[in-house]
Curated annotation (Swiss-Prot):
Gene Ontology molecular functions: acetaldehyde dehydrogenase (acetylating) activity; NAD binding
Binding-site residues, NAD(+): S162, A163, G164, P165, G166, T167, R168, K169, N170, N273
Pfam families, A to Z: AcetDehyd-dimer
GO BP: any one term: catabolic process
CDD domains cross-referenced by the UniProt entry: ALDH_C (cd23933)
UniProt xrefs under NCBIfam families: ac_ald_DH_ac, PRK08300.1
Gene3D superfamilies: Dihydrodipicolinate Reductase, domain 2, NAD(P)-binding Rossmann-like Domain
Reactions catalysed: acetaldehyde + NAD(+) + CoA = acetyl-CoA + NADH + H(+)
Active site residues per record: C131 (acyl-thioester intermediate)
Family per similarity comment: Belongs to the acetaldehyde dehydrogenase family.
Keywords: Aromatic hydrocarbons catabolism, NAD, Oxidoreductase, Plasmid
Name of the molecule in the record: Acetaldehyde dehydrogenase
Amino acid sequence: MTKKIKCALIGPGNIGTDLLAKLQRSAVLEPVWMVGIDPESDGLKRAREMGIKTTADGVDGLIPHMQADGVQIVFDATSAYVHAENSRKVNAQGALMIDLTPAAIGPFCVPPVNLIEHVGKGEMNVNMVTCGGQATIPMVAAVSRVQPVAYGEIIATVSSKSAGPGTRKNIDEFTRTTASAVEKVGGAKKGKAIIILNPAEPPLIMRDTVHCLLESEPDQAKITESIHAMIQEVQKYVPGYKLVNGPVFDGKRVSVFLEVEGLGDYLPKYAGNLDIMTAAAARTAEMFAEEILAGRLTLKPVHA
């Protein structure tokens, strides 16, 4: 039996429940706590049935147990409004916080683009941007590593059913955080993000459009090669990530059209937006866990 790093999840909604399913398959992570605020929530009930410890008292219900239960990594899948306080309390216990809200108080992490550089820095809070960011920023980065991108615009379309109350409350934060990460991680000089919730029935698969305006004429062969290479990187942890059309070149503009099919861990396969977020968070946590297990990373309490 290999040693696993123990984890807690805050937020038993769509994202938290999907993430729990992924963590249970991990070779290096073991989910032991699920934290919510509503004792009747489906997510808490489901976690209890799986034998996971639960609390409906929010993060304050978890803190007293973290040391005894050896929790070293905590995932926050609640809302941007409460994340800073959650993170402060968790960091004070010496645990790493992986933020799946658009709060973005820690540095952005998009695994195929910049995960490696984060792991060596010993950060105590990393932010997973947004589902739209995880799906599209690798494409912006694939273009910007070939030649400068003056402007990057991403449009993420997700099914209404896959957007729970937390996601809906965070729409403004979603657009701000994603646009910021299109610049900081994607490498665009200016970024813009748009999210569309589509109420169609049956629910539509996640679709993403990425437009990059270049400073000079595009090197079509190099950009095409870079995009295909990046798609293979993303597919390592989200197999349902695929290029539907593109790259399409129109003057200095490059456009890429994507679809993201989920694994169907919690919501059906149309909810690729959950998968790309939770798979990226699990991938990030696994990298940190491997460093901890190898003795290369020691987490220390952070007192605000």
